[in-house]
Regions:
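Active-site proximal loop and beta-alpha junction motif in alpha/beta enzyme cores
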Residues: 1-72, 78-295, 299
C-alpha cells in the first residue's frame, strides 16, 4: 500500500481548479501499473514521484493521462511540487525546487504560498492549412472566426487558435470524435476586451452558477479552453502547458502584454486563474498557481 495526495491546482477555492492525483512514492511500479492507476483516478493527469537521477534535481516525476504518458505538463508540475513539499520534501535551494521530468529539469519558484515554474522553450510553426481547416470544422468555426493559429510544442504539442471573441470561445461545442480522429490537441483563446468581454462575462457567470454560486474573481485578459480527446481528456479544466505555450506565442507577436491573467474551465463549472509574465531577460514565463486542498488515501 502506498499513499497518494489529491490537490486542486490553479485556484484558491475548493473544487474550482484542476485536480491532480500524486502518488508520493512511485518506486517499484511498472509502466503498466502507473497507466492503470491513472485510468482509475479518471483525472486529466496523475503523477508518480521518484528519486532523482539527474544531477541538481530534488525529485523526479512521471506524468500520466488516462491515454498515456506525457513528457511535461504544467498543472502536474505545480501540483506535484506542492504535494512533494507537503510530504516533507526538502529542496537544496530555499527559493527554488528543481524537478526532473522527461523534458529535463524544470525550476519551480517558491513565493510564499504560491509556486511558479519557468516554462520550457516552445517550438512554434504554422499549422498546415488542410489540418487547420479540419480543426476549425471540428470546432464548428468559420474560417473568419480564427484570427491566428500556431502549432506549439513545449513537450506536449498543442494546436493553438486565437479566436475573434471570448463569447466564441465559451460557446464552442466541439466534435470530440473528430478531434480524436485528427490526433490533435487543440487550445483556443480569445482576448477579453470591449463589448465581447461584457457578453462573455455574463456567460461565465451563468455557466459557473450551474454547479454553485459564481465566485468573485478578477476579470481575465484571455479566455482559454483546451481540448485533448486524443489522450482521453475531452476538455481539460486548466492547462499549464497550453497556457505557457499561448503566452510565449501571443507575447512574441505583441498580441498580449508581458503580464496578464488567463481564465480557463468556465464551461466545466471551474474557475481556473493562471497568472503569466515574462521576466527581465524576456524569455522566461512563470504561470503562478495557488493550491487549495490536499487529501490522502492509499493505493
Amino acid at each position: 500500500m502506498r499513499a497518494f495526495a489529491q490537490v486542486d491546482v490553479f485556484t484558491d477555492q475548493a473544487y474550482l481548479g484542476n485536480p491532480l492525483a500524486v502518488v508520493l512514492d512511485g518506486r517499484g511500479l511498472s509502466d503498466e501499473q502507473m497507466q492503470r492507476f491513472a485510468q482509475w483516478t479518471h483525472l486529466s493527469e496523475t503523477t508518480f514521484l521518484l528519486p532523482p537521477t539527474a544531477p541538481g534535481a530534488d525529485y523526479q516525476v512521471r506524468i500520466f493521462t488516462p491515454g498515456g504518458e506525457l513528457p511535461f505538463a504544467g498543472h502536474p508540475t505545480l501540483g506535484s511540487c506542492h504535494a512533494w513539499l507537503q510530504a516533507g520534501g526538502r529542496p537544496a535551494d530555499a527559493t527554488f525546487v528543481t524537478q526532473q521530468c522527461a523534458v529535463g529539469l524544470v525550476r519551480i519558484r517558491r513565493e510564499g504560498a504560491r509556486l511558479a515554474f519557468a516554462a520550457p522553450p516552445c517550438q512554434r510553426e504554422p499549422i498546415e492549412p488542410t489540418l487547420l481547416a479540419s480543426i476549425a470544422q471540428a470546432l464548428g468555426l468559420m474560417p473568419s472566426q480564427v484570427r491566428a493559429s500556431q502549432r506549439m510544442n513545449n513537450g506536449p504539442v498543442w494546436h493553438g487558435l486565437l479566436l475573434e471573441s471570448a463569447e466564441t470561445v465559451l460557446g464552442l461545442q466541439p466534435d470530440h470524435a473528430r478531434l480524436r480522429a485528427l490526433g490533435t490537441k487543440v487550445g483556443v483563446a480569445a482576448i477579453c476586451t470591449g463589448q465581447p468581454m461584457l457578453i462573455a462575462r455574463a456567460n461565465r457567470e451563468a455557466r459557473a452558477s450551474r454547479t454553485q454560486s459564481p465566485p468573485e474573481l478578477p476579470q481575465p485578459d484571455l479566455e482559454v479552453r483546451g481540448f485533448a480527446a486524443p489522450i482521453g481528456v475531452e476538455e481539460d479544466p486548466v492547462t499549464g502547458s497550453l497556457n505557457a505555450s499561448l503566452a510565449q506565442w501571443l507575447m512574441a507577436e505583441g498580441l498580449m502584454p508581458e503580464r496578464y491573467l488567463a481564465s480557463q474551465g468556465v464551461c466545466l463549472g471551474r474557475a481556473g486563474q493562471v497568472h503569466l509574465s515574462r521576466d527581465a531577460q524576456g524569455h522566461t514565463l512563470f504561470p503562478y498557481t495557488t493550491l487549495f486542498r490536499s487529501r490522502k488515501s492509499v493505493v
